[in-house]
Amino acid sequence: MTHPALALIEFDSIASGILAGDAMVKTAPVARIVAGTVHPGKYLVLVTGDVAPVQEALAAGLASDSNAVVDHVFLPGVHPQVPDAIAAARQPQIDEALGIVETSSVAAAIHAADAGLKAAQVTLLELRLADGLGGKGLAFFAGVVTDVEAAVDSSCVAIDSSGHLLNAVIIPQLHSEMAANLVEATRFRTLIS
């Protein structure tokens, strides 16, 4: 999923989300649309492609039913690690430090991940979106302490005004047992099955 621009709209109504997704692809020739349900009863519409069509599609989606929009994000120069992480790619390595940004929306987590990656030389260990999190989002950054601090700070600044930032922590020298758990999986059930 490598395209220069990415937009995502998060809806609290499945019907409104489907309506918006239809309007988005009818309005502009985006390269790709991915849409579907996530917990708890939300609907996500993600489009990628060239900047202008993605921006047009986003505007059409937001206009279709603005009352059902929980949050949205538009990234005209999305960092390459973000689409990979959305597609569930994980980077199984924690270096010197771990940074975690917790959000109340999927869109805010994606925005935070992009901002953090652009601010510092870090790896996006994982981007967790909604399912198994009660609709929350989590961005996990790994790298040297100063870079992780810069990534987390930039993430927080980028999404602070949205009201969707729940928490952000930096853990230098993560204990090896905790690191092993996080590298294997961040879902509890995955680790015990």
Residue ranges, per PLM feature:
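Long, contiguous binding/interaction regions
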Residues: 2-41, 56-88, 96-136, 142-193
